[in-house]
């Protein structure tokens, strides 16, 4: 049909089949159709597409933009996005961050220990040197007016960074995972706990990861890389 986007992702096609399959099965059960075509047909699941994220070069450009900016409003938005980028915290979690309540010290280093508002899952993420600078600039409280205005501002920042995708609050979280953490050799096991991800197969395992274990596996590499 004219104006309809072409579905190119096998994962997206699989999801359409998954939803449609349940209706076909119900129609077959009720006798509305003579046979269930899905009994002889299986679609491939496909691989999930990569999450868009900023590269290390783009992150460093963003840091320079903040250092050179004298606009108070722009600085507040930039700091909030950078705070998300270097903690992996979702918008709602970053907005409700309380330094006195959420900071713990392990092996002489500070970490943010909290629970995700969306899922209730615990997360522990390091306070990197650059994160501390951001907190100091904002009196240890990250404040922002609204998510809508924040995303509007980020569209302009995305253009300045030559992003091939819309820059949103979610991109900061993806950037933490792909560039800040995995890019410095953090294991997926530790990253999952740091971000408070939910996984049916491993939730119980990660929920029991002691903070000492997380600290030992993060090591000094992230702290040295992002000053």
Model-assigned labels for residue ranges:
Residues 25-36, 84-108, 189:
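Short, charged phosphate-coordinating catalytic segments
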Residues 82, 86, 173-201, 205, ...:
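C-terminal catalytic core of tyrosine-transesterase DNA break-rejoin enzymes
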Residues 68-71, 137-144, 152-193:
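Short, basic (Lys/Arg/His-rich) helix/loop patches that form interaction surfaces
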Residues 1-25, 30, 70-73, 143-149, ...:
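N-terminal core-binding DNA-recognition domain of tyrosine site-specific recombinases/integrases
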